[in-house]
């Protein structure tokens, strides 16, 4: 799937074709600048991408400007994660473009829940229909070894 949008006079494509998404760029972003993925290995980025629905924002010159992935069973549940926009392209609405495209792609699946975690983009996600978790006390987390606190170790 490829969607073409013009944002602030610039042409961008959102693609779900993994072959058009430069995972070296994604790895660079996530492993060095995304607080939730600092130090993530290139191998982990590739494995995660291969087992997810991927969304890449590509500019008119073919450069990757944004990325997100969705982990889903495509029947009841999806987790939106690793949402990242190139710092040089921020402020143009590319995060909103990614979020809107993801919602449009997931809606026909009839999922019961689509969840995500965000530190500072609540307002953007609300624009495409996300709400704060109504009963956060009902959710639990089994954290992995890189997450502070008790977990999988």
Regions found by a protein language model. Give the residues of each.
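A conserved beta-strand-loop-helix scaffold within acyl/acetyltransferase catalytic domains
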Residues: 43-61, 65-84
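Conserved active-site alpha-helix within GNAT-family acetyltransferase domains
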Residues: 96, 108-114, 118-144
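Active-site-proximal cofactor/substrate-binding loop regions of enzyme domains
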Residues: 85, 99-102
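Short amphipathic alpha-helix that is part of the acyltransferase structural core
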Residues: 1-40, 58, 150-153
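Hydrophobic/basic alpha-helical segments enriched in Actinobacteria
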Residues: 15-20, 65, 96, 137
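Conserved acetyl-CoA pyrophosphate-binding loop and the N-cap/start of the following alpha-helix
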Residues: 89-98
